[in-house]
Amino acid sequence: QIGVIELDHSLDIDEVTEIFIRINSKGTALSQSDFVMSKMAADTVHGGNILRKVVDYFCHLAVKPDFYPQMIKDLEFEKTEFASKIKWLAKDNEDIYNPDYNDMLRVAFMYSFNRAKLSDLVSLLSGRDFETREFKEEIVEDSYNKLCEGIKVFINEHNFEQFVLAIKGAGFKSSKQLNSQM
């Protein structure tokens, strides 16, 4: 079962991190993608909060297409360009590959930034200049724009369907074969 926790968009990264720590009091290690998602959720200036919803909703719909009626009740999200771009998942019954938010963030990040460490994405979304070790607003803006483009490529119906066809063409018949944690 996928749990969805809705956080107020006005929370800053420290407050979001504190919430994660409290929820995670049983000691489960947080992944870098958890930190990326919390960073995005806290950012309303550059649309990170909306991108976080795209990631959440896409991954949720990929597993459970009947979640769509609930998603469209989010009127803020419904007004964005992304709502129509992921609507196709409401009718998708393919279950050989159901990406989670780690998959989606990693692919979008590698595609747009030619980097693989999600900890670098957290730094870039914070505006870190890796050469000068300073934090710059233009890096934040550029990073959110690049991430947005990577997410758009990931959620594109044609691209996603082609990827699923490639998986099937490679001989995979079950999602269990794709998971390294069989």
Task: Pin down the residues of each PLM region.
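A cross-family structural signal marking well-folded subdomains
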Residues: 80-182
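Basic- and aromatic-enriched surface patches that contact anionic nucleotides/nucleic acids
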Residues: 1-103, 107, 115, 165
